[in-house]
Curated annotation (Swiss-Prot):
InterPro entries per the UniProt record, alphabetical: UPF0250_YbeD-like, YbeD-like_sf
Lineage top rank: taxon: Bacteria
Protein name per UniProt: UPF0250 protein NMC1112
HAMAP family: UPF0250 (MF_00659)
PANTHER family xref list: UPF0250 PROTEIN YBED (PTHR38036:SF1)
Family designation: Belongs to the UPF0250 family.
Gene3D superfamilies listed in its UniProt record: 3.30.70.260
Amino acid sequence: MTEQKNKTSLIEFPCTFPLKVMGAVHPEFEQAVLDTVRLHAPDTQAHHITTRPSSKGNYTGATVQVKVENQEQLDNIYRALTSHKLVKVVL
């Protein structure tokens, strides 16, 4: 498969991107998400994340406002989050 060199992105970089993360109800979920994002976006602070329980209380939802410089950085954050054991879905 040939990789496209000139991909057209709908996102203009750099930007602040809202990552939506759903995961397990766990006391360390919020910190785990924050720590994982910080691996690729070290300037991300605790006040950049908000969490809320799902309607039935089975999951926790988090929104992280992340400053990203390019598509590669955003892709790396997605890969890191989706591979975390407490994370179910990343949008």
